[in-house]
Amino acid sequence: MDSLFDLDQNDHMKFAPLAERMRPKKLSDVVGQELAVGPNSFLAKMIQKDMVPSILLFGPPGCGKTTIATVIANITKSKFVKLNATASGIKEIRDLAKSAKDELQFYQRRTIVFVDEIHRFNKGQQDILLPYVEDGTFILIGATTENPYFEINAPLLSRLRLIRLKALDEESIVEILERALNDRERGLGKHGYHVSRPVLKMVASYASGDSRAALNLLEQATALLEDNGTLTEKELKELAGEKILNYDKNGDYHYDVVSAFIKSMRGSDPDAALHYLARMINSGEKPSFISR
């Protein structure tokens, strides 16, 4: 795998969050998305043949979009490049296209470009991608939490195969948490923490279908324990506070977060206000809406 960031992977993973360390390396290890990436799915068959088409993965936070892209990066013989939608402009896209053409011409090697949060690209940036996807200069894998029919230009959308991922159910998240607890190399297994299934279900409930949020919460909760310690429901409740809210700009979760933000300001709670403000900004909310 080629990356824009050439860091020693082992050193990086020592300090990476639990959610990052526990990312599946094989498609068969992806939990809760059997319809999208199960053994008989279109995508699984194309990945096995190393013939990944341009696709758009869409679904709520923590459902496995980046994980699936990472699995493809681990398996493919193609050059794999991550592009940051918030930090890349038209020049970076054109430079990448030139590099992809050279890779194909001189090394007969395809380039796969992964753009996380592709909805953050404006119309001009999305338009620039179109001819390169169309003529096969590179294969595009986009990921978004937003409704692609509203956030992605129709011409580009028509060139991508849409793969919808669902929010993970409680059992799927519990399975992911159990893996993290038992894994001695990448997870928490060497610490010997004791976390009962009811407590794991509480963690899953707090996370609202977001596996990354669940793993982050588990990591924070167990960090307070001694080795071989037991995480109790009481300790988890004290740490977790309110149930984690999702955020969608045009749906119910959007108004939940906005309401919580307003209430925290009225209640003179700066920490809570900053938390909900950060969530809105991170989710792409327009500053003009927030300022109102």
What are the functions of these language-model segments?
Residues 201-206, 212-227, 234-241, 259-263, ...:
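C-terminal helical "lid" of AAA+/P-loop NTPase domains
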Residues 44-48, 115, 119-158:
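Conserved catalytic/switch belt of AAA+ P-loop NTPases
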Residues 36-41, 78-112, 122-123:
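Short glycine-rich substrate-engagement loop in P-loop NTPases that contacts/grips substrate
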Residues 78, 153-168:
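A short helix-turn-beta junction within AAA+ P-loop NTPase domains corresponding to the substrate/partner-engaging
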Residues 2-14, 45-84, 98-101, 130-135:
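Walker A/P-loop
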Residues 97, 159, 175-189:
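Conserved AAA+ ATPase "sensor/coupling" helix adjacent to the nucleotide-binding pocket
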Residues 1-49:
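A short, basic N-terminal segment
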Residues 84-86, 161-174:
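Conserved AAA+ ATPase "SRH/arginine-finger" region at the nucleotide-binding site
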